[in-house]
């Protein structure tokens, strides 16, 4: 059964500044690269996946810097403290709204598919009528009436609506897990 999740979905990106000399993801080899946090999907896992898909080993072929947050990663890249780095779409939108970014400030070398956010899940053994009603309520929730703290709990302040999500939406995550050789048993 499809359950609501946040929309729009963020995009992970590998980025650099225009005069870095780096024109492709493969050219990031032996350069510094800012990730936000090792536990971040858009700020670490998806950019590492993009590097791996380009033939780079994110553990050996780059000089990884963990900035600590998406904002810190953006600032390290923007201020040329690193040669390249992750810049997710939500951070880019936030920086644009604050006047800290304009088109042309960065070069985007790779972009992920939209990253599924955490879904609202419903126990499978609940009555179908209840599940359908809950999904309907969530899909028609007027997010503009929620304060920023409530929106953050729901996955971020940039969401505009809750939309149906299917299991197929997580195939990119499954491919990422396989490509990066992540042992899910060790994470539980």
Please provide the spans of the model-predicted regions.
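N-proximal short alpha-helices
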Residues: 1, 104-107, 146
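Short, glycine-/small- and polar/acidic-enriched structural segments
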Residues: 1-21
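Broad hydrophobic/π-residue packing in well-ordered secondary structure
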Residues: 8-10, 44, 61-67, 92, ...
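Short, exposed beta-strand "edge-strand" segments with a Pro/Gly-rich flavor and a Y/T-containing core
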Residues: 19-23, 51-54, 84, 155-168
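Pocket-lining segment of extracytoplasmic ligand-binding domains
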Residues: 20, 31-129, 136
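Short, charged, surface-exposed loops that flank catalytic or proteolytic processing sites
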Residues: 23-24, 133
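Well-ordered alpha/beta subsegment
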Residues: 27-29
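An extracytoplasmic/periplasmic, membrane-proximal ligand-sensing/linker region
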Residues: 122, 126-188
């Amino acid at each position: 059964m499809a359950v609501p999740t946040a929309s729009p979905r963020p995009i992970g990106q590998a980025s650099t500044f225009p005069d870095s000399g780096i024109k492709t993801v493969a050219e990031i080899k032996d350069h510094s690269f800012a990730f936000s946090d090792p536990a971040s999907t858009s700020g670490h896992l998806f950019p590492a996946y993009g590097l791996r898909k380009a033939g780079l080993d994110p553990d050996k072929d780059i000089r990884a810097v963990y900035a600590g947050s998406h904002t810190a990663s953006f600032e390290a890249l923007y201020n040329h403290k690193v040669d390249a780095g992750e810049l997710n779409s939500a951070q880019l939108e936030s920086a644009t709204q604050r006047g800290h970014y304009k088109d042309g400030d960065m070069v985007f070398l790779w972009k992920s598919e939209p990253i599924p956010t955490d879904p609202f899940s419903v126990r499978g053994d609940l009555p179908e009528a209840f599940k359908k009603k809950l999904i309907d309520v969530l899909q028609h929730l007027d997010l503009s009436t929620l304060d920023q703290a409530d929106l953050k709990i729901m996955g971020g302040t940039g969401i505009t609506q809750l939309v149906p999500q299917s299991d197929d939406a997580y195939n990119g995550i499954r491919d990422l897990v396989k490509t990066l050789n992540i042992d899910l048993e060790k994470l539980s």
